[in-house]
């Protein structure tokens, strides 16, 4: 229930407006070793994570969602992933929102839009979801198999799509093989180094230090894909 008056935040003593966005539950799922006898599709992992978030919240909220967001999977395409998630968690009446397929900022876009909808009073309970199964798809491809996962009608669509919905690469990039992000990132790093005026050794050391700190964060999260702390060396 949404309060009628500002709510006291006990730890800080601050008064919060009733429409202040609050994250009440978080859930994560990781499958480092694919089960090729019963391959789990992305939307199933997304639902599993949402159920974990509901347990984390300590209150049943999934079926009460006003909006369901989905960051679309790159490993298996669902035209309306948000709608599929909504139906699987019992929120069939919820509005559905999906971020655009490319950009890498889908998670943050979804959180920003969800917060805006809560502040405006358009929604009170919002679910934000996303999942991948790239390792499973790759392992199946090695065996010459294709996943037998959910296929929606081509005309299935969420209520809204947010983000820039355009091809990931233009013709010039594609013509010289700049398709995968790993190639483009290398060019960006070279441009950053040039702009900063540092030499290769300095820039390499800075990147190594950054990723060493990233790995320390991952090592503290049992749901990280590679929870191994690594040094800059």
Please report, for each region that a protein language model flagged, where it lies by residue.
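Conserved "HGTGT" condensation-loop signature of ketosynthase/thiolase-family condensing enzymes
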Residues: 1-100, 116-123, 127-233
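Short helix-initiation/N-cap motifs at beta->coil->alpha
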Residues: 103-104
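Conserved phosphate-binding catalytic cores of ATP/NTP-utilizing and phosphoryl-transfer enzymes
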Residues: 107-116
């Amino acid at each position: 229930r949404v309060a009628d008056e500002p709510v006291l935040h006990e730890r800080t003593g601050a008064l919060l407006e009733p429409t202040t966005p609050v994250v009440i539950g978080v859930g994560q799922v990781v499958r480092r070793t694919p089960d090729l006898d019963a391959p789990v599709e992305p939307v199933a992992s997304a639902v599993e994570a949402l159920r974990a978030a509901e347990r984390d919240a300590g209150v049943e909220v999934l079926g009460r969602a006003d909006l369901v967001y989905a960051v679309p999977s790159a490993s298996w395409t669902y035209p309306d992933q948000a709608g599929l998630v909504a139906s699987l968690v019992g929120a069939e009446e919820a509005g559905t929102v999906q971020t655009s397929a490319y950009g890498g900022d889908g998670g943050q876009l979804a959180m920003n839009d969800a917060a805006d909808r809560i502040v405006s009073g358009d929604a009170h309970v919002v679910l934000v979801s996303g999942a991948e199964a790239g390792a499973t798809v790759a392992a199946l491809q090695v065996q010459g198999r294709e996943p037998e996962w959910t296929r929606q009608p081509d005309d299935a669509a969420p209520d809204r799509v947010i983000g820039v919905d355009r091809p990931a690469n233009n013709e010039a990039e594609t013509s010289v093989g700049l398709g995968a992000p790993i190639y483009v990132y290398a060019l960006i790093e070279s441009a950053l180094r040039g702009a900063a005026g540092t030499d290769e050794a300095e820039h390499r050391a800075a990147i190594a230090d950054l990723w060493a700190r990233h790995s320390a964060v991952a090592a503290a999260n049992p749901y990280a894909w590679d929870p191994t702390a690594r040094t800059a060396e």
